[in-house]
Amino acid sequence: MAKGFYISKALGILGILLGVAAVATIIALSVVYAQEKNKNAEHVPQAPTSPTITTTAAITLDQSKPWNRYRLPTTLLPDSYNVTLRPYLTPNADGLYIFKGKSIVRLLCQEPTDVIIIHSKKLNYTTQGHMVVLRGVGDSQVPEIDRTELVELTEYLVVHLKGSLQPGHMYEMESEFQGELADDLAGFYRSEYMEGNVKKVLATTQMQSTDARKSFPCFDEPAMKATFNITLIHPNNLTALSNMPPKGSSTPLAEDPNWSVTEFETTPVMSTYLLAYIVSEFQSVNETAQNGVLIRIWARPNAIAEGHGMYALNVTGPILNFFANHYNTSYPLPKSDQIALPDFNAGAMENWGLVTYRENALLFDPQSSSISNKERVVTVIAHELAHQWFGNLVTLAWWNDLWLNEGFASYVEYLGADHAEPTWNLKDLIVPGDVYRVMAVDALASSHPLTTPAEEVNTPAQISEMFDSISYSKGASVIRMLSNFLTEDLFKEGLASYLHAFAYQNTTYLDLWEHLQKAVDAQTSIRLPDTVRAIMDRWTLQMGFPVITVDTKTGNISQKHFLLDSESNVTRSSAFDYLWIVPISSIKNGVMQDHYWLRDVSQAQNDLFKTASDDWVLLNVNVTGYFQVNYDEDNWRMIQHQLQTNLSVIPVINRAQVIYDSFNLATAHMVPVTLALDNTLFLNGEKEYMPWQAALSSLSYFSLMFDRSEVYGPMKKYLRKQVEPLFQHFETLTKNWTERPENLMDQYSEINAISTACSNGLPQCENLAKTLFDQWMSDPENNPIHPNLRSTIYCNAIAQGGQDQWDFAWGQLQQAQLVNEADKLRSALACSNEVWLLNRYLGYTLNPDLIRKQDATSTINSIASNVIGQPLAWDFVQSNWKKLFQDYGGGSFSFSNLIQGVTRRFSSEFELQQLEQFKKNNMDVGFGSGTRALEQALEKTKANIKWVKENKEVVLNWFIEHS
């Protein structure tokens, strides 16, 4: 699943607006982590009761009863399912949308058992008498059913038998049921959109991780693989899709010719969370790939007619071919459908053969979409198609190893997208998009290892917590590091061996290490200091990462667990004492040096890192290692001198690294904050995107801490001075903003130039924004603002303006036909400086007719990113937490993002007290998947308070001196 924030799976890059309006997203990251699923606790009518049916909600779980444990017993394994579903796309007499279903699951008994336990959630069983009918297969004798019950807390349907099922025998269990086709974005749900003035309704799915059980009774764990025969009964004017192609043409339903029956081919052996089925009037654009695979892009008819699916169609074939070669394994299905949904809480979902997307992750309009929208489409597609092998063909055994699934896809998405767009240098974007982004979380004492013990991940909420930036971005970072020190060819060799060995099966991360080790052992050119497992265990089984410190006078090199707050208490022990086996590359005076391994010791010495008086050395070339680097002050000063005299000697990524690392080290009190600020002085001569992005990203923290204090004025003045040469460069290059640079990185650099100039008050930029927006308001049918610049221009113009500008943008949002344009407007509306407008906007997030449920939390976070909106958003969340939690479901990963977003500025004792009181006040409601984020927010707030006290005066003086 893509980072929905994935989140937010990168994918794009975050542009920082350090202005009066806010810190706003300019280059959107592929739905960075705000995602997965919404579990809406909506009311579902109960089935008629009978003496043989009981509904149990266990309060105190008696663990001796298997139905009170969250993990399924292994006494029964599913072999196959036959599932028929009929969604009703108009409400019934009670005003509810429902679906009806029938399921036959064939079971293989592994051990004698007198109870059948199968997942079921919010389903009402309509079978007469007992909830199910049980039959033997072949000569298998079936005992009578004693009683059936629903256990609400553990989400089970339990069938108690009067005798035992026998090992080696097959049985079939049949049930009929109905459920609500709710708008809760989970399981089998409904999505709505407007076509003109007509409301259209479609039925779609989101099963990951634990909501297949909301669609039909099933063994809803990833290792419980089976084959599926899906049949959909649907209105005859609509199209039915599922994982596999239809067996033939749809046939009329015998009892009602207005309905059609579509039966699909049997799936391969697969996990329940990868199932998908959709009923809609969507249309598609199609092509057949060279290998015979049918590729189709589905969307609303208007979007297809306007060509918004063509870019996705054009890149899908090359990406599929790339991964088939990368994995040395053919694409395992006969077709690849991808569909853009109006309502979808994840960024995208890798359902096997029927991938679902948010519209802004699949659709692209060359006339109205920005370059970052285009980059997002190609990277999200690459992420999801990577899963068709790694995750779908070979699947994790349990959710505690989610990082292997999502981390791997989050790494190779850059490779697949780079193949589709070879001139963009997309592979470099993993550094700002994933590596440094996740280090900010992984450097907290409240972080967690990539691999979590299976026994700690049981409930749906615990599973949802696995879908975080550690799993996605740290997973991607360490797999990239592994591929780099093995070499990509050797890595691919081991990967292909792994996929061939475990096709249609389940694995743990140890299985991948074993096959990579076999590839290492079969050659002699790559020599490792230890086994793949021994090296990687230190990166996956302990949280955090090291800071490597070099003393260039002696050549001494040491490592230490890096913590942003060096005084924080690390309560999680490590079998490796927080030491790592670290692959180190280095440059001395612009020349590459031999590779070096720092073993799992705290200190070593090597002359590679020793310099003469005028020399400098720089470690972690292109940031292929997952660590940060500190030097003695003389070496830092020599690097600064090199950057200010001839910056091209240092690779672009490492120019960004110097900024990222030094600011993080300053936060951790390992270097003076003035040294980090000195590392930005060279930017007045820098034209490349990544160093500027590093500075803006790092300084965004300064903005959050100081935009309510006297530091902010001198800080803005300094940034105006530094960015003005870049602004003038692109003003000339683009012929006064009438053209766009040719390559991706230059376009991103242009966006940073104009966003930084406008948000820090450069008059010519503010005038540009006002002029362009005024032109648009005077002629709404002709938008003169290039899509690349719209986020910046919209935000700045709304910040400068008042109600007229806000209402105009809101009106344009209501009319927007392209979701990318709607996203830009929705974010920009949060830039207003009018308190009453922001409060009104917050209220809109509680009304799904005004702000879609999938967009509610990101809208609140956009308002919170505005210095004026932040206290309003915090008050709003406090006042409405119970409603938000109940309406959206505590399992939704977006709660983690919401807590992070509204507390980012917290840096005072009063705000800390408020946060602690918020925790206390809502213990009865709970925080669901936001529980860890709340603890991290408390930790960050304490660190912020301390940092501001220690650094405010010196930072103020530095900005005054250099502005």
UniProtKB/Swiss-Prot annotation:
Transmembrane segments: 9-32
One of the GO BP terms on file: proteolysis
Keywords in alphabetical order: Aminopeptidase, Angiogenesis, Cell membrane, Developmental protein, Differentiation, Disulfide bond, Glycoprotein, Host cell receptor for virus entry, Host-virus interaction, Hydrolase, Membrane, Metal-binding, Metalloprotease, Protease, Receptor, Signal-anchor, Sulfation, Transmembrane, Transmembrane helix, Zinc
Cofactor descriptive note: Binds 1 zinc ion per subunit.
Active site positions, chain numbering: E384 (proton acceptor)
GO-annotated molecular function: alanyl aminopeptidase activity; metalloaminopeptidase activity; peptide binding; virus receptor activity; zinc ion binding
InterPro entries: Aminopeptidase_N-like_N (IPR045357), Aminopeptidase_N-like_N_sf (IPR042097), ERAP1-like_C_dom (IPR024571), M1_APN-typ (IPR034016), Peptidase_M1 (IPR001930), Peptidase_M1_aminopeptidases (IPR050344), Peptidase_M1_dom (IPR014782), Peptidase_M4/M1_CTD_sf (IPR027268)
Membrane protein topology class: Single-pass type II membrane protein
Database matches in Pfam families: ERAP1_C, Peptidase_M1, Peptidase_M1_N
Swiss-Prot/TrEMBL catalytic activity: Release of an N-terminal amino acid, Xaa-|-Yaa- from a peptide, amide or arylamide. Xaa is preferably Ala, but may be most amino acids including Pro (slow action). When a terminal hydrophobic residue is followed by a prolyl residue, the two may be released as an intact Xaa-Pro dipeptide
Membrane topology, Cytoplasmic segments: 2-8
Co-factor requirement: Zn(2+)
Positions that bind Zn(2+): H383, H387, E406
Site residues (Transition state stabilizer), renumbered to this chain: Y472
Region (Metalloprotease): 65-963
Annotated region described as Cytosolic Ser/Thr-rich junction, given as residue ranges: 33-64
Protease is among the record's keywords: yes
Disulfide bonds: C758-C765, C795-C831
Role played: Broad specificity aminopeptidase which plays a role in the final digestion of peptides generated from hydrolysis of proteins by gastric and pancreatic proteases. Also involved in the processing of various peptides including peptide hormones, such as angiotensin III and IV, neuropeptides, and chemokines. May also be involved the cleavage of peptides bound to major histocompatibility complex class II molecules of antigen presenting cells. May have a role in angiogenesis and promote cholesterol crystallization.
Protein name: Aminopeptidase N
